A protein has these predicted regions:
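Domain-level signature for soluble enzymes in the chorismate/prephenate branch of the shikimate pathway
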Residues: 2-393
Length: 393
């Protein structure tokens, strides 16, 4: 059998194909005869061939970038979060539909993930078990071509990245309804790790199970928070079904897979991992429930153009009048927007506190750099935990 090499597709050929594709009213018009339908299918096949050839060409170009850097004697950073954010923003800005922006971003994320895996598959530790929203955050940010490592605690995630057993880690930092994950903040007090990315994930709760109908459900298992977030839907649709709180939504999904009559409330990733059917989608009572996750790494990265910086600072004697104002005044003077501030006990001495601050911009931007230099002079403790691309959605 002779294997034919894929026909090379140039940028001009892709542009020609794009011009030949139907647009506007013609794109919406359905074929009215069998012959017309076959013609449309033939065009789809041709476009698929071009897409596949272009994706492979992109993968070859990505390999060339890595080889070129290695030959020059540079330390090769195969994963560049600032570059990936720029690519995603460009894809979003080009999008004219009919695909939604979210779908375009997901497709480009997976293409970049697959291309990166050809060079150096990333190992990403996350707060497990499998099927949790944290795993969904990993896949949203890195794509499905990474090696995702579920761990039992936030401490373990930090340790895996600190010891270089994992390239990156993903941990929750705050939820729009539940507030801050304090243990994540506290871990930064003793860790050298940097923040090199963020993920903002809309928490979508789905009812899932192995059965085909709601009438076959005898009990619904989920984490207590998820049960509370879906209280009204459960009251309206399954008022007589037992609600069983469990340690995690992943545990709920496992029980739904293994126990006859059990269903689970969990995220879409849990349905994929445990092979369950989604019986009812997005059953949460509030549609604005969002969790923010941080991506942990061992180094800082260059600006992407739309960035956020996270600081760890202390003013020393926080009981002195105006101490916090004097600490933060340089941000206002240099017109740097503060988006979040949290206080935590410093663990150094009684009633001594540190502040975790999020602000707009990258630490290397001149305006931000001037503000931080002034702030550093007023602080008894000052650390830039990270400057990283804002979540692309």
């Amino acid at each position: 059998m002779v294997r034919r090499a894929p026909r090379a597709v140039t940028a001009s050929a892709a542009a020609t194909a794009a011009r030949a594709a139907p647009t506007g009213a013609n794109a919406a018009a359905a074929p009215t005869t069998p012959a017309a339908l076959e013609a449309v299918r033939a065009r789809i096949d041709a476009v698929d061939e071009q897409i596949q050839a272009l994706i492979n060409e992109r993968a070859r170009l990505a390999q060339q970038v890595g080889i070129s850097k290695a030959k020059d004697g540079h330390t090769v950073d195969f994963y560049r979060p600032e570059r990936e954010a720029q690519v995603l923003r460009a894809a979003r800005s080009r999008n004219t539909g009919p695909l939604r922006d979210a779908e375009v971003l997901r497709l480009f994320r997976e293409i970049m993930s697959a291309c990166l895996a050809q060079q150096e598959p990333l190992k990403v530790a996350f707060l497990g078990p499998e099927g949790t929203f944290t795993q969904t955050a990993v896949l949203t940010h890195f794509g499905h071509s990474v090696r995702a490592l579920p761990l039992g605690s936030i401490d373990e995630v930090f340790h895996e990245v600190e010891s270089a057993s994992a390239d990156f880690g993903v941990v929750p930092i705050e939820n729009s309804t539940e507030g801050t994950v304090n243990h994540t903040l506290d871990r930064f007090l003793s860790s050298p790790l940097k923040v090199c990315g963020e993920v903002e994930l809309r928490v979508r709760q789905h009812l899932m199970g192995a059965m085909n109908a709601l009438s076959r459900i005898e009990r619904v298992c989920s984490h207590p928070q998820s049960l509370a977030q879906c209280r009204q839907w459960l009251q309206d649709h399954l008022p007589d079904v037992e609600q069983v709180p469990v340690a995690s939504n992943a545990e709920a999904a496992r029980r739904a897979r293994d126990e006859r009559g059990s269903a689970a409330i969990a995220g879409e990733t849990a349905a994929e991992v445990y092979g369950l059917k989604v019986l009812a989608a997005e059953i949460e009572d509030r549609s604005d429930n969002t969790t923010r996750f941080l991506v942990l790494g061992r180094k800082l990265f260059a600006p992407s153009g739309e960035d956020r910086t996270t600081l760890l600072v202390s003013v020393g004697h926080t009981d002195a009048p105006g101490a916090l104002y004097r600490l933060l005044e340089p941000l206002a003077r240099h017109r740097v927007s503060l988006t979040r501030i949290e206080s935590r006990p410093s663990r150094r001495r009684k009633w001594d506190y540190v502040f975790f601050i999020d602000l707009e911009g990258h630490a290397q931007e001149p305006r931000v750099a001037r503000a931080l230099a002034s702030l550093k002079k007023r602080a008894s403790l000052f650390r830039v935990l990270g400057s990283y691309p804002r979540a692309v959605q």
